[in-house]
Amino acid sequence: MKKGTLVIFRHGQTDFNKNHLMTGKLDVPLTAMGEEQAREAGRLIEGMSFDHAYSSTLSRAFNTAALALGQTTSNDHLKKADGTWHIVRDADIIEVDAGDFAGRNHKTDPEIVNFKRAFDRPVPGGESQKQAVERVGRFFENEVLPKLERGENVLVVCHAGIVRAFDFVLGTEKVPADGGGNPNKKRIPNATPTVYEYEDGKLVRFFQIDNQKEIDAANENKSTPVKKARPPKSGG
């Protein structure tokens, strides 16, 4: 039996998150708090050894992955000769395009507040959740699943909208039957790892890690409950 593990988490906090601004594909840096959140994510996955690491092409995701890996002692094999991390950047896991809403406050802007969301309805000038799911599905089928089937471990650091898209791709959320139902609006905390355990390419268990007790239990292959996520910073 081939056992592989996929770990996914969102990047750390940015100023756009802090100020409730829609981010989408805009490339904004981590705040000091976001950098510390990334390091904490690394401490949570300490003891896990990854064969492959991926991030989106945006700096907030890549830097979160690098800072997280820097807190681990079991992933030095992913370091390049110059000491930087071998993290593959993939455009298929870039944040959902916020289009005309990018840079605007999603709590107070009336156009955003009153926009009727649907799974297959894109925001003005941007993407729908359905479109994001399609490209995340392509990324998973081409880059991740073959590695899990070989019993390898994969780290993916991305964005809130992409974590939601992974829910559909991995089967932990159901795609609306008519394609036009409500989108996944699950709150996604910054830099909080979720572990997906696979056997022979099939998902058998998943859980979120938010304390050291859980990661210790995970490393011992013991079942642990999903912890309630801390409130996230919004916006991509």
Where are these regions (language model features)?
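Loop-to-helix element that buttresses phosphate recognition and phosphoryl-transfer chemistry
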Residues: Q13-T64, G125-G137
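Short glycine/proline- and acidic residue-enriched helix-loop micro-motifs
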Residues: I112-Q131
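GST superfamily/GST-like fold recognition
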Residues: A160-R164, V204
